[in-house]
Amino acid sequence: GSGLVGSEMCIRDSYTPKERYLRQIADNGLQDEVILHDRFIPDEQVKYYFSAVDFVVQPYKTATQSGVTQIAYQFCVPMVVTDVGGLSEIVPDGRVGYVCEPTVQGVADAIARMYDGDTIERFRLNCIEERKRFSWEEMCTRIAELYEMVR
């Protein structure tokens, strides 16, 4: 098994051929622990996925930003993101999730740390405050401040 007793993993990936995952799942005897979703998820169903998970892992090797991050904020779901592109700018390390090296070991270590004590719940609570940075109200306030500075 995975070593995480009573845990399941839900994978949503539209970029990697599913055969690769199916082979890894079978080779490791994880058929009862992994749910693979390799199809488009309509907007009206997204809430079910984010409500069912303890946290989101975005193990990108390269990225700029991620729409998944903003959705995770909306549902107050903690995150593990790799330190690529601008992800570390929108996921403060140790506050709403962990920013890790874009390596298998880096991601694995960050996932394990999520299960330390009350980390997940603490990150969920921090997310309530942190997500305000991305609200329309905050954006309008910052635009108005910028306008006043350049006027």
Ranges and model annotations:
Residues 48-64, 77:
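Acidic donor-binding loop of glycosyltransferase active sites
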Residues 78-81, 91:
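Short hydrophobic beta-strand element within catalytic cores of glycosyltransferases
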Residues 60-70, 88-89:
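Nucleotide-sugar-dependent
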Residues 119-133, 142-145:
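A short, well-ordered alpha-helix in the C-terminal region of glycosyltransferases
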Residues 93-104, 112-118:
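Conserved acidic donor-binding segment of nucleotide-sugar-dependent glycosyltransferases
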Residues 19-40:
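Nucleotide-activated donor-binding/catalytic signature segment of Leloir-type glycosyltransferases, i.e.
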Residues 41-52, 70, 74, 92:
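Short acidic alpha-helix that forms the nucleotide-activated donor recognition element
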Residues 1-11:
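Single conserved hydrophobic/aromatic residue that forms the stacking wall/gate
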